Amino acid sequence: MTETKGATVRVAVEDGIAMVTVDNPPVNAISQAIRQGLIDAMAEINGNPEVAAAIIIGAGRYFMAGADVREFDKPALPPSLPEAISSIESSEKPVVAAIHGVALGGGLEVALGCHYRIVDPGAKLGLPEVALGIIPGSGGTQRLPRLIGFAKALDLISSGRQAGAGEAAEMGLVDAVAEGELAAAAMDFIRQRIGAAPPRLSAIDPPAPESQDFFETARARLARRARGQESIVRALDALEAATLPFDQGAKREREIFNELRGSDQAKALRHAFFVKPREVASIGVVGGGTMGAGIAVASLRAGYQVTMVEASSDALTRGLGNVEKNL
């Protein structure tokens, strides 16, 4: 075995198979270092004649839980995630994503850029970007419908929900569910595909929508459901761009992503994602009747300082009495 040490991405070669391990605790967020590490790893793999295929896997509990959201409010640092994914997809040697834990957002987009996908039975996959006021911006809206069709792709992207391993296999999102240890299963899987031309989703002709009025009907339905949330409706705009040649559709997707990233809605949702609730030290209770006294008693028992407010001193005295009776 040979191994190249890196800060966040490691490459180990054994019996002609390169194991590319993404290691960025706690959730393997796809930071600038991860993006650069993936590009460097693919260059090393394709330049090594002893390597016939590669596996991309995550260290710890997850494959990759998405982009590093903390970077969204800062100037973009190269390389971009689309560039990193392109370096994987363009590999002349087959690459399989070995997914455990979760592959979410950019993590699933990385997996879609791999030629194959194998998952642990407990894995979850999804594109939850709409919950942050954005859309998948690294080819997810372009590759996913080419793999599973527009209807299923729209369901996953517009809802942001996660699909389990069984559902992912049934819809064609993954190629196999691992039996036994994931890394070993991925090794067996990719060995059987050495020498075959790696399938690339970006090379597939644009798919036809399920019906002639698919986008029109979906847009009306999503507008009602979105209730003003821009990202849900704009996700459909990006998906519709998948009817174009891949490069054109990917360019449109990135334009929409960048427009949404700087929007007030996205900024507010990112704030809500990171904000921590303020610590509560004291509680005010208005009214000392049965309900107010009950709230006061529960709060006191939980260790909070309680201030009771009533309309008169007599009512306050009765309220305090109600509290004392229940303590």
Where are the predicted features?
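NAD(P)+-binding Rossmann beta1-loop-alpha1 motif at the extreme N-terminus of oxidoreductases
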Residues: 275-326
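Gly/Pro- and small hydrophobic-enriched strand-loop and loop-to-helix capping segments
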Residues: 115-137, 174-187, 309-313
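Conserved CoA-thioester-binding segment of acyl-CoA-metabolizing enzymes
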Residues: 1-59, 83-86
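Glycine- (often His-adjacent) and acidic-residue-rich active-site loop
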Residues: 57-87, 103, 131-134, 314
